């Protein structure tokens, strides 16, 4: 009965709609019935969305009018009809089978059913995008309840959701805050708590493994917590490029634009990969403008300051600076210890404070490497059946510790500082006391104290045979200047990033 009812409705739609619209949107739909359920299959996500948005209210009206008051349960899915029915999901009348079809409910507040004449008018005014369309949701696994239509009443048990690709484990609650990331965390929270009215765009930059992606996911998760129906999409910049290439291949660039410009928040990681991709930059430029003009939130990350991204158009660099640009720095010692203690607590592992301090002193580059080292220590402890001690840490991380000592040496620090300040290494070792030499020398000594395991006398010895009190004075002086002098603070951060990345 349901299939015959559907065919009757299709014939009525054929009379109502222009031939091109009917052939593009209605004819490709396939249908199968099981009991009082009518399953309508669209060939891809875009056709499904378009039918949902433009024609569903009229379809439901026709089913109700010609179903003698017993309209079937209607399910819109992506795929094609099969001999075997999709499996039912718990708490939902219908769910998509793994790879052949996926359930996709329509919007939560369907428009009132229009009259036949208004349906014709609205349909005629609709833009006609490509039929062979880009499917930005391909491979999504979310399963939702179908639409129900009963006695002129449309009850929607689920809402169509963009796949967010967010990692639910990255939240503000488990983000360890310290001086190095305090401003970035505060800015991210402001955006999450007050989107569209805070900083737009928010641009986070810094080296790998410092927490930029964590903060970005935390914002997205908080936005969805506040509004589960929000369209929040996270992706790597290379995914944006791949989607655009796919859209061009399918002659479906309009669908690509429609998808990315319809989100409430767009979160793109590693924006530096847009460099020298002219068509991608062109498309993102217009997408970026459309989102900001529409009041939608944009968050971007990069491994460097936007002005320093070579191969990126100046107009993009300029727009990235419209909102707030914040650096995420390598964590200082106290923050590294706090991260280790928190991760150990989450893993329900007893990590002595002195052991955490030992690891944090030697693993300085980024949080990702720090967590990796802790996992190795925990695994070693578990397999050996021993408590975590400094001795066990030395055993489990011996290759990593040896590599760290080799990479960050006093010689390397002296060479890097000399290049940065455009002086000679011999100047750092000389007795010259002019500020242009003395200040870089003090910076190099402070970095040597922080990044190596050498004692103060050993550091003084390799800086021209200076006394350990001279090294101590240099370290204290640089710490004071980092608080009061923005130039010294920026120089020190840049050098620290260079030496530990």
UniProtKB/Swiss-Prot annotation:
Region of interest (Domain IV, binds dsDNA), residue spans: 382-501
In its UniProt record, which GO terms are filed under biological process? Answer: DNA replication initiation; regulation of DNA replication
Quaternary data:
Oligomerizes as a right-handed, spiral filament on DNA at oriC.
Q: Which family does it belong to?
A: Belongs to the DnaA family.
Q: Record-annotated residues binding ATP?
A: 209, 211-213
Which residue intervals are annotated with compositional bias (Low complexity) in the record?
A: 103-121
According to the record, the residues making up region (Disordered) are 103-150
Stored NCBIfam families: DnaA
Instruction: Please identify the protein, giving its name as recorded.
Output: Chromosomal replication initiator protein DnaA
Any one Pfam family here would be Bac_DnaA
User: Residues annotated as region Domain I, interacts with DnaA modulators?
Assistant: 1-90
Role, per record: Plays an essential role in the initiation and regulation of chromosomal replication. ATP-DnaA binds to the origin of replication (oriC) to initiate formation of the DNA replication initiation complex once per cell cycle. Binds the DnaA box (a 9 base pair repeat at the origin) and separates the double-stranded (ds)DNA. Forms a right-handed helical filament on oriC DNA; dsDNA binds to the exterior of the filament while single-stranded (ss)DNA is stabiized in the filament's interior.
Lineage, top-rank taxon, reads: Bacteria
Mention one GO molecular function: ATP hydrolysis activity
InterPro entries membership: AAA+_ATPase (IPR003593), Chromosome_initiator_DnaA (IPR001957), Chromosome_initiator_DnaA-like (IPR020591), Chromosome_initiator_DnaA_CS (IPR018312), DnaA_C (IPR013159), DnaA_dom (IPR013317), DnaA_N_dom (IPR024633), DnaA_N_sf (IPR038454)
GO cellular component terms listed in the entry, alphabetical order? cytoplasm; plasma membrane
Q: Where is the composition biased (Basic and acidic residues)?
A: 122-134
Localization, per the record, is: Cytoplasm
User: Which stretches of sequence are listed as region Domain II?
Assistant: 91-164
**What's in the keyword line of the UniProt record?**
ATP-binding, Cytoplasm, DNA replication, DNA-binding, Lipid-binding, Nucleotide-binding
What's noted about domains in the record? Domain I is involved in oligomerization and binding regulators, domain II is flexibile and of varying length in different bacteria, domain III forms the AAA+ region, while domain IV binds dsDNA.
Q: Which organism is it from?
A: Pseudomonas fluorescens (strain SBW25)
Renumbered residue ranges of the record's region Domain III, AAA+ region: 165-381
Principal localization?
cytoplasm
